[in-house]
Amino acid sequence: INAVVEVHTPSITNLDDHNEQEPREECGVYGVWAPGEEVSKLTYFGLFALQHRGQEAAGIAVGDDDRIVVFKDMGLVANIFDESTLSALQGNVAVGHTRYSTAGGKEWSNVQPMFSTSSTGVDIALGHNGNLVNYLELREEAVQRGLIKPHEESVSDSMCLSMLLADGVDEDTSVFDSARD
């Protein structure tokens, strides 16, 4: 499986000068790699614990050697996932995400994890916390590669990154090499 998770945790230097002692809300990201375990349930409980970081939406991507399955929706973690849904999310690796919008609208298309497939069939699930400071440059690169239309406004920074990573993967280039490029 080729899954990439980028995690950013804000530090005190990222806080507004006026509120240095107060935490800022940002998303929560939780990852699990545990062969032989029910990673969807472990991820669910991790997201439940992180839910204070984002109560707008949540999602879990679970994978094995053959595929990645993503389930995500708007709402609280406990309202999105039930026993039936978690049982259907089978695999040995997972990434979960709770959303608090800082960029992009409060709409389903911005709920993470993001999912993209490379031209060679490699699936990528990405959970991202924070804002990409070079989003406009990445977006322009995605437009130049034909991944998004020039005037398409609904592409979040995380979806843009996911599409660029997938686009860079081929027989000779791994997801990790694509991220370095």
Task: For each feature predicted by the language model, list its residue ranges.
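Conserved short alpha-helical segments that host acidic/polar catalytic motifs at enzyme active sites
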Residues: 2-181
